[in-house]
Amino acid sequence: MPVALIIDDSDANRKLARVVLRADGFETVEAATGAEGVALAMEHVPDVILMDLRLPDMDGADAARSLKADERTARIPVVALSVMPVEESGEWLVSAGFAGWLAKPIRVGTFPDQVRSYCAGG
C-alpha cells in the first residue's frame, strides 16, 4: 500500500486529498506546515510527497530543497500542488527538486492515478 505525505495548510485541501487517496488504497500522513512536513517525511519515508507551494512557514520550493538535500528523503518524488499554471512555473519547479505538478482543486476522478504515477517504483 503506497504512502502519500500531504503537506498543505488548508484543512479542506488535506481532507479532500486524504479521502480520495485512502478510498483508492493509499495510506496518508498529513502536515499543515513545511517544517512539519519535512520532519514527517524523514520519520515516515513516504512513497510520494504532495506539497502546496504556499505554506505559512516556508515556501514549498524551500521545503522541497530541504527534502532533496537529505539522503533519507532525496529519492522521494515531491509533487507540487498549486493553482499556478504549470507553464508559468515548470522550470523553477524542476530546479527546486519537484518531480511534477498537479492542479488544485484536485480532480477526484483522476487524482489517485496521477499520484500513483509518481510513487517510487510505481
How would you describe each model-predicted region?
Residues 8, 55:
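Conserved acidic carboxylate
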Residues 15-23:
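Charged docking surfaces used in two-component/phosphorelay signaling
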Residues 25-32, 40:
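Short hydrophobic/Thr-rich beta-strand motif most characteristic of the beta2 strand and flanking loop
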Residues 56, 74, 86:
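The feature encodes the CheY-like receiver
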